[in-house]
Amino acid sequence: SSAASDVYKRQGVSRASKINRILLPAVLQWLGQGQNPDMGLLNWRKLEERFGTDSEYLGFLRDSNSAAQRLCHVLSNSRFLGDALNKSVESVTWLGDDDALIARSRESLDVQCRSSLSRNADGINDFATSMRAMRRHEIERIGLARLSGVMDETACLTGMTDVYDAIIDAALTWAIRYQTSAMGLGEPPAAIAAIGMGRYGGQEVNFSSDADMILLYRPADGTDEQVANQFARKVVDALRQVLQGPTTLEPKIEIDLDLRPEGKNGPLIRSYASCREYYSSWANTWEHQALLRARFVAGDRALGEDFLHDIADPLRYPISPLTDAQLGEIRKLKARMEAERLPLSLIHISEPTR
């Protein structure tokens, strides 16, 4: 291919080019075994252009027992990871060390988050950059581990969920502290909790997942409800700026609040009392079912546990069996979701002829 010839043309007599000449025959063979060899070769070329003049990079690939072959497998099978590797030569070195590919523990992630919180108490840009870079870094690590066969799918899903949990908890902590100071208050006028929903609540986060959440608050003792509500809304604004606002060039961490009470028509955050009233009086059957994956993820744990125990559990684990009307609603929702996911051609094929 033209990309391969270009690689050969750039080879000179330097140490780096000599190493590259040794590697390239095997590299081309390994890239050819991937799902998209052309993409793999293009990614290899980009890496060479960025790091190839550094003989240590190529020397590492030559001397490692597994790194070069793993790298080729990644480059020819994952556009996401190929692009990510082009930004960090450190990530390439992980491919030669199984221990470096293992997902970090939640405790280790929390230590890094606390360090960033202490360094960036007032600077939203620096804090947002550190959190988003951390997410990119750790998701990249886990993705490389999965494609290298170091971690299975279950461990990867758990590891990625831990990354999201740690970062969202730190971002919420930062937003609460920031708004408490901005409003000239000594203490937060409300406790705030985030409840994971959907795939995020079910600990099935992947590379491109949004974090589905419900946010709620509870006024502190003796605090005016209006003050607590104003504070909570400003905290949500700050949280969204940290995770997905235009504050940094690092990729956004998308949060999705559409599963909240009243959906897109409802407030982004509402009080515990308001949530309780809504779910007991107005929620549809599908909203009860959506609570099956609800779990506490960030913020005030006591508030989160109260929501799960007092509001979610009676609805998602009802004592009485579902009524015919409720079962009918669930079947309709299931049929609609399946229709939305199926290609149009398959829907037409499955429809009976008239």
Task: Give residue ranges: language-model regions.
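A nucleotide- and high-energy phosphate-metabolite-utilizing enzyme signature
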Residues: 1, 5-346, 350
